Each structure stands twice: as C-alpha cells, then as structure tokens.
C-alpha cells in the first residue's frame, strides 16, 4: 500500500511564497486585507492573547491555596517555588528536625496539588502528612544543600537543610479538600469560551489552510489534494465529504477524512493536526486504515495519536473496551481487531460548510471533559495528561512561523511532532524546561507530570506572542511579489509590466553571492520570473519573496539563430485546465423544474406529493456538478417517473414526464452506448442504484480503467431480486432516541393487523389478552429483549425501527432456537414470522429498508461481485494441481493411516478442509489431539457469518457470557441439540485455546441459490474472507465448509477456483460410514458459466491499443531532451542488455541515411515512417509493428477535431522501440534536432504531452495512407462541452 506521491503543479499559486499564497486564499477577515501592512501584527497579537487567557490550572491552584491561607491568617506562598518533600528518615534536637541524606520524593506544591497527592491521601493513614519526621512544605526542593562542616556528632551524617518547614502538609491538604480545583477551573473555562469561541474557530481554519500551503509548496501535497483541501476550507459541500475519524466508534476530537465526491473510488486525505505532515493522501480508505495501523506500532506515534481522543473515551471498564485498548489491539494486529473494520467503524459525516465551528465545539467539550478527569482523578487509567487546547495551540504556532519567522517561538516543532500528531515530549530551546522540571520520586517520569509542566512553556510562548508588536517598518516589507521585485531589482512597479522577453535580464547578487536574474519567459503566457543558474544554459525558478527554489521548474537559456537574441523558455508552467471528460453529463437538453412545471401543468389540479418529489429531484440534478452524483440522481428521477406512471397510468402529466425521461436517457447515454443503455435499463423496474453502479462500471471499462466486467455484472443484477428493484422503502427521518443504525422501518405497525394470521390468538399468547397483532408486538419485543435477543428493535410513535439485518434474524431465529421453555422462548420466532408475512411480494429490503441501507446494499453487492470476478482473473492452478491433481491422489490418500493423513495435511499443506457435516465434525473432534500435536492453531467455519458473530465468538473464547446471537445460531445449526456437533466444535476450540473464525458471508442474501451468478457471488465473498483471515505465515488450520465452496465451479469467463485451491489445501469429506476421503476437483467444473447469448457490447474498449487517459496531457518539467530520455531507455531492459541496446540506438542516430529522413513538416509521418522502417531493416535490425497515436484537440469554441501521428519501430529483447524521424513537426526543445527513439509507450506519452493531446488513443501498429487518414479516437472519448466552458 502506498499513498499517492506524484506532484505536477499547474495551480495558480505556484511560484509564490507561502506567505503570499496564504493572504490570497484565506477568507476575508478584516485583519487579512491584502494591502493592510499591519495585518500580521494584529493576527499574531490576537493569537497570543487568546493563548495567554487560556484557563491555567497552575494559576488556579496558586489562587486557591493563597486564599485559603489568608482566611487562616497565614502568609502566602508561591507554590511554584515551594516544595512538598518526603523523607525516608529524620531525627530531632532542641526542637529542630534534621534530615540527612534521605530525601526520597520532592514535588513543587503546584505539581502535588494537580496530581492529587493531598486529596487522594486525605482519608488514608495520616501519619505521612502529619509527621514532621516524614514530610512537609519546604522552601527548598531537591536542590537542598548539605552541611558537612556542621558537626552534630559522630553518629550523624551530614545534615540536609534548610531544616525548618514553612507549613505542615495538612495545612495545604485541608484547603484543597474544602475547595474544588475543578469547580474553579470550570468557571474560568466557561468565561474563556464565551470570549474566544469565534476567534478560535478562525484560528482553526487559518491553520488548516496554512498547513496545506506549506505542504503544497514543499511538494508533499498534490494539486488534486490541495484543491480538495481548499474546497474543504471554503466549505464546498458539493465537492468534498468530511468524515470524523473514529476508532471502534470512539470519535476523535479533530482528525478528519476528506473525500472527493463523484469518483468511482474516491481519493481520501487524512488531516491530523499537529502531525509532521498534517495532510496525508491515499488512493482509498483501506490504505488510510492500514497506514494508521502501521504507525500505531511505534510507541511515540501511539502516544501522540491517543491525544486526539478524550480521556473519557480512554478509560476502560469491565463491560466495554476503551480507545486505548482498541488502539493497542489494532497495533498488535489482533485477528479480532482488524484495522480495516475498527478504524472508521461508525463514520460520522460533518457539515463541510460549518466544519471549523464544529471542531471548535468539539475542542470545547473535550477540554471540559478532560479537565474533569484530570483534576478529579489521578488513577492509572487517566494519568496521561491530555493538553487538549494547549497542544492544539502548539500545532498552530507554525502558521505564525510561516508568516513572520522572526517571532522566535521557544518550541522546536520538528522534534515535537510525529506522523500521528504531537507528543508531550516537546523540546524547548535552552535549559528553561529542565529548570522547570524540578522533582524526584515515583511520579516524576509520568506523563501527567510532563503534561502539567508544559503549561508554563505555553504561557511563555503566549507572552512572547501577545507582546510582539512592531512598527510598520519592522514588519517584513514585501506584501506582494511586485513590491519585492521592484525593491530588490531597484525599479518602479510600473516598469515590471513593460519588461518583455526581448529585454536583457536584470541581475543582482543575493546574500549567498548567487547571481539572481529577473526575466520574462518567451513561451505560453510569458510570466515574469526570478532565476538562479544551475549550470550551462539551465536555470531554476525561485520564489520572488523568499528566494526559495521552486522544485521542478527548469528554465533554458536559448539563442534565436536568426536574430542572435537570447531568450528564456520553460514548459514547467504551461497553461493548464481541468481534464476534459467524455462522460461529462450535459443538461443542455434536460428541462429545468420551471420548464417542467409549464409543460406538465394541468388546469385546476394541484401539485401532489409524487410530483413534488420529481421536481425536487430535477432541481438537485441541475444543482449538482459532480459526475457520479449527477448520473445517480438522473437514474433516481427516471425511477420516480416510472413509479409515477405505475401508480397513476391515466395522469394528464404523463406525456411531459415521459418526455423528460427521454431527455434524461439521452443525456446519460452517448449514441455509442445505445446497446448498453438497453441492457442496463431493461433491468426489471429499472432500479436506480444498480443502474448508477453499472453505468459507472461501463464508463470505466470504456476508458480502459477496469477489466471487462460490465456484462457479467448486468447478468448478476438481472438475477438478484434486490439489486434489480427500485427503492420503495422508508425515506423519512430517524428519531434521535434511536441509538443504533437503522436498517428497516415499518412506518405504521397497524399493517400487522392486515396479514392473514392472527398471532395474538395463538395458545402461547391467550393469557396476554391482546386484541390484535399490532397490540401483541410490543410484548413480543419486550420479552425477546429480556432474553437477550432483538436488542436493536424499537417502537416509537407507532413506527417499528429495526437495526438487525434480515440475514441475522434468519440465522438466529428458528423453531430450533426459539422453543417454548427454551432459553430464548417463542417470542422472537413469532416476531420474525410476522415480519416475513407482512413483507408481501416485495421482499423485506424493498418493502422496509431505509434509503441509505438500500443504496448501500445494492452498491455493495455489485462491488462485491466485481471483486469476486477479479478473484478468478489469472488464477494459477499449477501449485494446487502439482500436489492434488494426480488422478490417483484419492487412492494415495486412502492408503495412509489416519495419523499419517493428519500429519501430511498439517505439515505439508498447512491445513485441510472438511465438508461441513456433523459426521466430519465428530471425526475431527475424535482426532483433535492428533491435529493439535501437529500444530493446529485455528478452526474456520463457513456456516457462521463473520460480520454478525465473530465478536461474540471472541467473547465466548475469553469466557464472557455475552454471546446470545451466536448461541441461537448454534441451536439452529444443531437443530435444537444442546450437545450438537457445531456447539461441541466451538467448545473444543475454547478448551484447547484454538482460534475459531467465522468466515461465512452476510449481505442479506440467504443461500442456497439456484442461479450460478448468485452462487458465485456468495462463494467469492467467503473465499475472500478466508484468504484474509487464514492465508498467513505460521497458521495451521482446519476449515469446515459446504461442499460447493470447496472445489472449482463455473465462473464468469473462466472457472471459479474453490476455497481449497486458494488456500492450497486438500478438500475432504467423512462419508456415512465414517470413512475420511479426499474430494478431487472435477475437471468438468473448471469451465465458464454458460451464456446463451453473448452481447455485442460485452467488450466496451477498442479491440486493439489502449486509451492513454481521459484527460488533457501536458508537459510537466520542460521539453524532453536527449538527457531526460536516457533513463527511459536504460530502464527498459535488464542491465546486462543495456550496453547492446545503446549501441543499436547510437548506430541509428549516427546513420547518414537515417538522418536524411528527418523532417519537420506537418503530416510528414505518413511518408517518412515507411522509409524509416525500410532503413531499419537494411541496417539488420528486427522490424517491429510500429505504433500510431491519435487524439482530440480543441479548435476553438465548441469544435473539436482529431490529429494523428505514426512511427516505425524495431524489436530488441522482446520489446518494441519507436524510431520517429518526423516528431520535430511538434513543439520541442530548440536544441532537440535528433531522431526520437523510445520504448513505444514512452514515445506515445511524449507525443501526447508535447501536443497537449486530449484523450489520446494508441494502437501498436504503424499506419499509412487511408488507414492513417481514417485513424481517429473512439467516438465515446470525444469531449462534450457546454457554452459555459
């Protein structure tokens, strides 16, 4: 797994200082006006004052102690320079107490108070705090002097002094017991947030932007990532979705995930305030989760990461796991705590437009909760002091450092940050921190002691900032690039605009004696740039204000041979723009809601609810500018129109609605996709969720991004009753009182009174005296929940809310698990029977699912099926067949003794699979000792769904009684037998400390299935789970699974390997006579699924060649040169062939006849490439197929044309190398006069970049004459633009 790391900047801020970018992009607060030269001073002062006013527990302690002393008529003390000392021995003489070299612990009084030493010991044995011989409040701490010259006699050691106490310890303890530090803190806290909430919100947003700018200018944030961050900063909810990171359902205070909307596999950015690199980009959330898990293995990262969660969440309980334990389990890669499940376990989406206000409120609440824990308790569970707001301030100080480096903040950020945030081990410049960290004893090394001693560091920083006030002249002078250039190059600003590419460079010397040039480039938009020479004719661009290098921005100094003038050219900043998309779904031909109202108007007839939904959906479509969201909404609108026609077939509005539906179809499906459209829209009832997914899959397939899977996914959708159905379930709100994710809603429980069976009349419920099924329902739930079942069901205001999946209920509720007198009684079975009857012909998901659950169900099924098909791609049967493919292997297996078979399975193959019968389980248990002796570590079973019961399995194995659902499922599997085979299998795993894994698949689909596609889907997902959980080094396992899962079955386009083929183990069965036999993989099963009619659109991509990309290509690092092409050639072959390849290339380039073919005329490739091919043959080189490339280009306005180019090639070491003698007809480096030789794909990429090609397509054959003239990109790649662009 890798994060995205490319950097290809064409953003408008490139070439500017971080300071300049910040002022241009930040929101328009009064103190950030572009021309207000004092804005930095105001910015820093406000920030410092806010820090300085932060409620300070150390100051509060001082206030409480001295007010308590004054009430007793005692003198004040400074608790920061007064110490609570504990001695191991003492003696007295003439009323004085002498302590020798026996100081065991010493804390400043402030530290002792905040660590609750006095309050915790208040009701203990008070000998410690009352005894002058043991402890006291002293004016000197661990630096107490020794007096060896004072002779008290030979029996005494040197005396420790001064030896008089200021107060007895009990004096301070009484004050703290009578007055709560927490209550005092809370008062200051409320006043603080009332005053600074808005400013703190602004500071969060400013720091968010500043950190992004710093990363962007350092090239650790891509263009795409920076744009996503900016969209987040500006609250563009249409572009990005913000999710609060959570671990096992515990939300962090301030870590967020940013996802770009509208992409098939959205890119995601993780934002960790205080991290060394706060923004980390990933290709998907799975990579993000794995990255976090990896970093948690490092203790310093773990410590830092914990600080993003409140102390309240970090406490452990007997019945729940806190965040600390959850993180520990994830870091240890505990099988029961996989990172991909428990990171983002219960995602919470935040309002993008209100993000920083939300984060401010979360910080406020966190600070309140943490302070409660910190000040009230000093238990081991809470000893790690969370700096909360203070650490947030520290993470934001680098924004000030970016704006005004001269402030001199006394914190070394580089050493205080980790990848997962700030640790409390902050390094402070100088020795001030060590001087503060006075103290010896058991608590000195605790994180609590470290934390409370950082508060003075923050205060010192705040004082520096709040006092930082300078005149205009002292603030850095350059607030625009123009000002900087004018002053440094000693010209007036107006003259800058008149500098032309023809003018000679203006040159100065910087402080490092480097020659710095100011020139205007002679290409593209002719920007004014500052350069520093690298060597020869090469220069690097530098920022005008800071003189920092802009990486990758090379500029060449060239001479015009005609005029002999010197010019500076660069392609590092070509004019750019968003990539063109052939799949831009234009709405030019789709009515707006206003037009629809006019066309569908019926005099005297009001607009009904169905019509209102159509209008609302149409408005959302026109408001959306995200491709995937828009096409999904359009399919949903088509679905609404179909449902409207179904329910109101005689409506006078239908003609208008049908016309609108036609418009939507035309906008969604290109003419070239007509056959595909018919296939997708022939899905019964045209379910919008499936149509959205399938069109997106087809688009990706047409673009060459994915494999050929659309046809099989459509067949699967046609055979799945949920995928193919339109949504008819519940689209309303969920009451706040519901504390579980709701999957199904029955809006009015009176529907239970309309079913055929009167359950309330059954003998078991006669004594309840209920008069209807709906009246019976609350009692059924009450009694079921008292037995530990159906806990996620709630009736509120006559509506039933269900959080269990249908499959969970199906597997756990049955006549076997729910018998009268049994542990779970009859009530759940009655409830489930009522549900099954009330669903009618629609099916449970279609009738009652919530919109979110239904959409997720549809897309997840199709996505999982797509992954299942990927499992079959390029699967190599060879390793399995080499061992088990022998036609006589079953005889060899039978010839061995039982012990020999077990030993062979467990030591040669890492395991064995059994058919999941009670006979197989009994056989296994009878031989369990032998399996264990041969290293058995795990048992896996496909009859239990992992996502439903794996957690309860873990709880059972650990001795917990909380496994009701698992218990009920075992009753079901064992047909009510309390001593059944499956229960004995689980108990044996517990007794022998063997891991037990459920690998069954749960997706509201209940096997067995009759059609092969659904069987394939179910099988593939179980195999994927088994691979993830079992295919690891060091594991030895036994798997129990249905026989249809064990070996190969027909698959899509190729056979579907079985569980044993993937795990490379044998499949076995125990027959009715108790004989253990090998199950061979039948050759007749290794075939594709039979398809009666192969659709002509099944292969959507062009049969030859490939699309390089659906975007506009451009150069990113200047024109290619001989030197820049050299690595591409060297890396194309192995090192031992490199010299021979370069000799052939040199021969071609030095050949006189070949050089005579070089041509710069447009279109010359048609005539030149055959001559090049002929010359290559004459030179004794193996001729290649050549290559041709074609692309779109914009002619202006709305018009597009296509262009093409072709080349010859030669073969070497199995690769083809383009030899292009006509490439100079395209823009190029002025020093580039040679023949272009590159691997074919690299050649195509360079030609595309130099021509700013749009959606280029390459075929691996040279074309001439009519073949070249007719060569054009596939029509579906032609960009579709609107006038607005």
UniProtKB/Swiss-Prot annotation:
It is a single-pass membrane protein. Its main location: cytoplasm. This is a dermonecrotic toxin. This osteolytic toxin, induces bone resorption. Potent mitogen. This toxin is associated with the severe progressive form of the atrophic rhinitis, a major respiratory disease in pigs. It is found in: Cytoplasm; Secreted; Host membrane. The chain crosses the membrane at residues 402-422. The keyword Transmembrane applies. GO terms for biological process: symbiont-mediated killing of host cell; symbiont-mediated perturbation of host cell cycle progression; symbiont-mediated perturbation of host G protein-coupled receptor signal transduction pathway. InterPro entries: Dermonecrotic/RTX_toxin_MLD, Papain-like_cys_pep_sf, ToxA-like_C2, ToxA_barrel, ToxA_C3, ToxA_N. GO terms for cellular component: cytoplasm; extracellular region; host cell plasma membrane; membrane. It comes from Pasteurella multocida. Closely spaced cysteine and histidine residues may provide the toxin with an affinity for metal. The sequence shown is that of strain NCTC 12178. GO terms for molecular function: phospholipase activity; phospholipid binding; toxin activity. This is Dermonecrotic toxin. Signal peptide: none annotated. Keywords: Cytoplasm, Host membrane, Membrane, Secreted, Toxin, Transmembrane, Transmembrane helix, Virulence. It comes from the Bacteria. The keyword Membrane applies.
């Amino acid at each position: 797994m890798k994060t995205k790391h490319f950097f290809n900047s064409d953003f408008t801020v490139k070439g500017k200082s971080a300071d300049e970018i910040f002022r241009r992009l930040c929101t328009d607060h009064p103190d950030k006006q572009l021309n207000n030269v004092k804005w930095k001073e105001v910015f820093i002062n406000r920030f410092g004052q806010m820090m300085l006013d932060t409620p300070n527990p150390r100051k509060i302690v001082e206030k409480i102690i001295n007010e308590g002393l004054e009430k007793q008529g005692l003198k004040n003390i400074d608790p920061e320079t007064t110490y609570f000392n504990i001695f191991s021995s003492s003696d007295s003489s003439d009323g004085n107490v002498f302590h020798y070299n026996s100081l065991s612990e010493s804390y400043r009084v402030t530290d002792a108070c905040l660590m609750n030493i006095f309050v915790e010991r208040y009701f203990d044995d008070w000998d410690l705090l009352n005894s002058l011989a043991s402890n006291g409040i002293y004016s000197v701490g661990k630096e107490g002097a020794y007096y060896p010259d004072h002779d008290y006699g030979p029996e005494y050691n040197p005396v420790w002094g001064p030896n008089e106490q200021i107060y007895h310890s009990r004096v301070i303890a009484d004050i703290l017991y009578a007055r709560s530090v927490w209550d005092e803190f809370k008062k200051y806290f409320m006043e603080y947030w009332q005053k600074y909430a808005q400013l703190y919100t602004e500071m969060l947003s400013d720091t968010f932007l500043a950190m992004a700018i710093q990363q962007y200018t350092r090239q650790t944030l891509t263009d795409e990532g920076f744009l996503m961050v900016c969209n987040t900063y500006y609250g563009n909810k249409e572009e990005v979705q913000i999710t609060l990171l959570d671990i096992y359902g515990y939300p962090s205070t301030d870590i967020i995930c940013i996802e770009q909307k509208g992409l098939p596999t959205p890119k995601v950015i993780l934002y960790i305030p205080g991290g060394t690199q706060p923004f980390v980009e990933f290709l998907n959330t799975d990579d993000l989760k794995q990255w976090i898990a990896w970093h948690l293995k490092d203790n310093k990262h773990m410590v830092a990461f914990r600080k993003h969660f409140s102390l309240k969440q970090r406490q452990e309980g007997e019945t729940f796991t806190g965040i600390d334990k959850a993180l520990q389990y994830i870091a240890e890669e505990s099988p029961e705590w996989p990172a991909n499940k428990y990171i983002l376990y219960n995602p919470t989406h935040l309002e993008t437009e209100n993000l920083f206000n939300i984060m401010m409120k979360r910080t406020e609440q966190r600070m309140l909760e943490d302070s409660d824990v910190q000040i009230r308790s000093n238990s081991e569970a809470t000893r790690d002091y969370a700096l909360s707001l203070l650490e947030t301030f520290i993470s934001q100080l680098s924004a000030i450092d970016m704006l005004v480096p001269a402030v001199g903040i006394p914190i070394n950020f580089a050493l205080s940050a980790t990848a997962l945030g700030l640790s409390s081990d902050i390094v402070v410049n100088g020795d001030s921190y060590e001087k503060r960290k006075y103290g010896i004893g058991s608590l000195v090394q605790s994180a609590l002691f470290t934390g409370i001693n950082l508060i003075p560091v923050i205060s010192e920083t705040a004082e520096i900032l709040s006092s930082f006030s300078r005149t205009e002249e002292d603030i850095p002078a350059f607030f625009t690039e123009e000002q900087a250039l004018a002053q440094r190059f000693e010209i007036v600003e107006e003259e800058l605009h008149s500098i032309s590419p023809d003018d000679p460079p203006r040159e100065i010397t910087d402080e490092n004696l480097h020659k710095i040039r100011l020139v205007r480039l002679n290409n593209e938009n002719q920007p004014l740039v500052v350069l520093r020479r690298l060597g020869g004719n090469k220069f690097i661009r530098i920022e005008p204000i800071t003189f920092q290098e802009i990486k990758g921005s090379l500029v060449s100094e060239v001479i015009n041979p005609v005029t002999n003038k010197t010019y500076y050219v660069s392609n590092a900043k070509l004019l750019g723009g968003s990539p063109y998309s052939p799949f831009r779904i234009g709405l030019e031909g789709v009515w707006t809601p206003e037009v629809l109202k006019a066309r569908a108007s019926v005099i005297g007839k009001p607009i009904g609810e169905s019509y209102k939904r159509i209008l609302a959906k149409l408005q959302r479509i026109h408001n959306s500018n995200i491709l995937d969201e828009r096409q999904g909404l359009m399919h949903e609108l088509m679905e609404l129109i179909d449902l409207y026609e179904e329910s109101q077939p005689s409506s006078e509005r239908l003609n208008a609605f049908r016309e609108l539906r036609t418009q939507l179809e035309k906008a969604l499906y290109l003419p070239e996709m007509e056959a595909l459209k018919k296939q997708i829209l022939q899905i019964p009832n045209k379910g919008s969720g499936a149509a959205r997914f399938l069109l997106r899959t087809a688009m990706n397939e047409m673009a060459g991004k994915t494999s050929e899977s659309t046809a099989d996914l459509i067949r699967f959708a046609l055979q799945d009753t949920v995928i193919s159905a339109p949504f008819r379930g519940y689209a309303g709100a969920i009451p706040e009182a519901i504390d579980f994710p709701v999957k199904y809603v029955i809006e009015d429980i009176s529907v239970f009174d309309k079913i055929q069976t009167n359950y309330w009349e059954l003998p078991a419920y006669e004594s309840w005296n209920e008069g209807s099924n709906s009246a019976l329902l609350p009692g059924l739930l009450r009694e079921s929940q008292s037995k530990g079942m159906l806990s996620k069901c709630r009736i509120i205001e006559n509506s039933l809310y269900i959080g269990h999946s249908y499959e969970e209920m199906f597997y756990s509720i049955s006549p076997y698990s729910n018998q009268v007198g049994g542990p779970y009684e009859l009530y759940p079975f009655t409830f489930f029977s009522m549900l099954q009857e009330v669903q009618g012909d629609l099916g449970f998901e279609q009738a009652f699912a919530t919109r979110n659950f239904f959409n997720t169900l549809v897309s997840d099924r199709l996505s999982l099926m797509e992954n299942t098909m990927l499992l079959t791609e390029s699967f190599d049967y060879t390793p399995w067949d080499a061992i088990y493919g022998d036609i006589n292997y079953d005889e060899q297996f039978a010839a061995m003794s039982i012990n020999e078979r077990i030993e062979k399975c467990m030591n040669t193959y890492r395991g064995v699979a059994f058919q999941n019968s009670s006979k197989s389980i009994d056989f296994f248990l009878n031989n369990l000792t032998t399996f264990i002796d041969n290293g058995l570590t795990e048992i896996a079973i496909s009859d239990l769904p992992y996502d439903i019961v794996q957690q309860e399995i873990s709880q059972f194995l650990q001795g917990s009684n909380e496994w009701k659902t698992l218990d009920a499922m075992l009753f079901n599997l064992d047909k009510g037998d309390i001593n059944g085979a499956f229960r004995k299998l689980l108990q044996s795993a517990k007794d022998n400390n063997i891991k037990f894994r459920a690998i069954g698949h749960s997706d509201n689909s209940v096997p067995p299935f009759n059609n092969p596609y659904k069987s394939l889907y179910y099988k593939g997902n179980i195999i994927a789970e088994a691979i993830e959980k079992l295919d690891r080094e060091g594991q030895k396992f036994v798997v129990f699974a249905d026989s249809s899962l064990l070996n190969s079955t027909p698959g899509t386009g190729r056979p579907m390997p079985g569980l044993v083929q993937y795990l490379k183990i044998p499949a076995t069965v125990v027959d009715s006579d108790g004989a253990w036999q090998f199950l061979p993989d039948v050759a007749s099963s290794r075939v594709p699924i039979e398809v009666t009619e192969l659709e002509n659109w099944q292969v959507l991509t062009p049969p030859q060649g490939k699309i390089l990309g659906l975007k506009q290509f451009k150069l990113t690092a200047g024109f290619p040169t001989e030197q820049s092409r050299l690595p591409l050639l060297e890396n194309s072959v192995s090192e031992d062939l490199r010299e021979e390849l370069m000799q052939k290339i040199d021969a071609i380039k030095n050949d006189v006849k070949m050089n005579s073919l070089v041509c710069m005329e447009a279109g010359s490739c048609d005539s030149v490439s055959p001559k090049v091919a002929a010359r290559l043959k004459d030179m004794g080189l193996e001729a290649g197929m050549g290559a041709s490339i074609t692309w779109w280009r914009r002619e202006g306005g709305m018009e597009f044309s296509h262009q093409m180019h072709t080349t010859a090639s030669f073969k070497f070491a199995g690769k083809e190398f383009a030899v292009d003698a006509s490439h100079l007809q395209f823009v190029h480096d002025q020093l580039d006069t040679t023949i272009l030789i590159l691997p074919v794909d690299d050649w195509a990429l360079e030609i595309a970049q130099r021509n700013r090609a749009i959606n280029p397509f390459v075929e691996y054959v040279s074309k001439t004459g009519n073949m070249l003239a007719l060569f054009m990109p596939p029509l579906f790649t032609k960009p579709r633009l609107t006038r607005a662009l």
